[in-house]
Amino acid sequence: MTSIRKSHLTLKALNESMIDLPAPKNISAWWNFGSLLSLCLALQILTGLFLAMHYTSDISTAFSSVVHICRDVNYGWLIRSIHANGASFFFICIYLHIGRGLYYGSYLNKEAWSAGVILLLLVMMTAFVGYVLPWGQMSFWGATVITNLLSAIPYVGENIVQWLWGGFSVDSATLTRFFAFHFLFPFGIIAMTLVHLLFLHEKGSSNPVGINSNADKIYFHPYFIYKDLIGFAWFALFLITLVLFIPNLLGDPENFTPANPLVTPPHIKPEWYFLFAYAILRSIPNKLGGVFALLASILILLIVPILHTSKWQNFAFRPLAQIFMGLLVVDVAILTWIGGMPVEPPFIIIGQIASFLYFFLFLVFFPLSGWLENKMLESCTKSSALRALVL
């Protein structure tokens, strides 16, 4: 008799995605971040739902409602802290997931990679509108500065900004629609996650050595289910430690002050996980050029599969590419640091150099390393063939 999980229409799809899914037996802990992102998404939706029950999206009461949640709602402080710090962990997992995809050549599955980049954009938009909701100083001024960038679009920019604001400045209408967006976007994220998984499971996961593993696969359950549970345990440990001991570590002190349009903070900046893109934006003196650079810093991931020139899928056997990958990690860390610094020397020139290097690595160094490694491989192959002929 066929098991119900293999015959029932709904359970069959779940079974093929989580239980009987054939997975390469040699995938490492770097492949855990996909499941961790699912956990993060579920956690954010659950905590966000409870916060939405007590939050009011009006500029006169928004800040007070957040204070009310923390002071008067049972475990409200815990729910808010998990939601705020969970967003940071969400982006840590996303960036590590993207880094793994770059290193191990997962971008060669173009459909899954493109769906992943769209997912990244959706998550970034969700996080941005969510950052505005507490209506603190940095929330207000961050919303004003970032949304005002749309005015750089020729001809229609000013109209788009006013439409987004719901008036001539960031006000109650802006907060209401940002709350609506923040509530709705996660459903779009869920839909794109399913598309991402659909394309991923169509071809199967990559593996650390970058070769076809069809002849050597095992069931996802129980082996990788338990492996993922270990990742969940570590994730919970780090998140709860941060939430209970240093919950405000990754936040901005300015957000403890209610929004005041008459007082500008000395240094306006977004959350830490957007700082690398913000640094690239600030490195271009022209407003429209800065907006293009900001978008390009994310959308450049879409052309990574096109720029792949190596005969190897991943960087595991490519020493030159490994050096450039290390440079990229350091460069993003420098950009994140620069994004949190004031716009003054020497931070301006450091940011411009780091921004140039960021694009140069993707557009020149990675394709060049593949081409050089191919030439070295051909040279070694020819010399080996000649040696064999001589012998």
Swiss-Prot record:
Main localization of the protein described in the UniProt heading: mitochondrion
InterPro entries xref list: Cyt_b/b6_C, Cyt_b/b6_C_sf, Cyt_b/b6_N, Cytb/b6-like_sf, Cytochrome_b, Cytochrome_b_C_euk/bac, Cytochrome_b_N_euk/bac, Di-haem_cyt_TM
CDD domains: cytochrome_b_C, Cytochrome_b_N
Gene3D superfamilies given in the database record: Cytochrome Bc1 Complex, Chain C (1.20.810.10)
Binding, heme b b566: H97, H196
Entry binding sites for a ubiquinone: H201
Any one GO CC term of the record: respiratory chain complex III
Lineage: Eukaryota, Metazoa, Chordata, Craniata, Vertebrata
TM region(s), chain numbering: 33-53, 77-98, 113-133, 178-198, 226-246, 288-308, 320-340, 347-367
Miscellaneous section: Heme 1 (or BL or b562) is low-potential and absorbs at about 562 nm, and heme 2 (or BH or b566) is high-potential and absorbs at about 566 nm.
Function: Component of the ubiquinol-cytochrome c reductase complex (complex III or cytochrome b-c1 complex) that is part of the mitochondrial respiratory chain. The b-c1 complex mediates electron transfer from ubiquinol to cytochrome c. Contributes to the generation of a proton gradient across the mitochondrial membrane that is then used for ATP synthesis.
GO BP terms, alphabetized: mitochondrial electron transport, ubiquinol to cytochrome c
Alphabetized PROSITE patterns for the sequence: CYTB_CTER, CYTB_NTER
Topological category with respect to the lipid bilayer: Multi-pass membrane protein
Cofactor: binding comment: Binds 2 heme b groups non-covalently.
Similarity annotation: Belongs to the cytochrome b family.
Keywords linked to the UniProt accession: Electron transport, Heme, Iron, Membrane, Metal-binding, Mitochondrion, Mitochondrion inner membrane, Respiratory chain, Transmembrane, Transmembrane helix, Transport, Ubiquinone
Organism for this UniProt entry: Kryptolebias marmoratus (Mangrove killifish)
Protein name, UniProt field: Cytochrome b
Required co-factors: heme b
Protein location: Mitochondrion inner membrane
GO terms assigned for molecular function: metal ion binding; ubiquinol-cytochrome-c reductase activity
Sequence positions that bind heme b b562: H83, H182
Keyword Transferase in annotation: no
UniProt subunit comment: The cytochrome bc1 complex contains 3 respiratory subunits (MT-CYB, CYC1 and UQCRFS1), 2 core proteins (UQCRC1 and UQCRC2) and probably 6 low-molecular weight proteins.
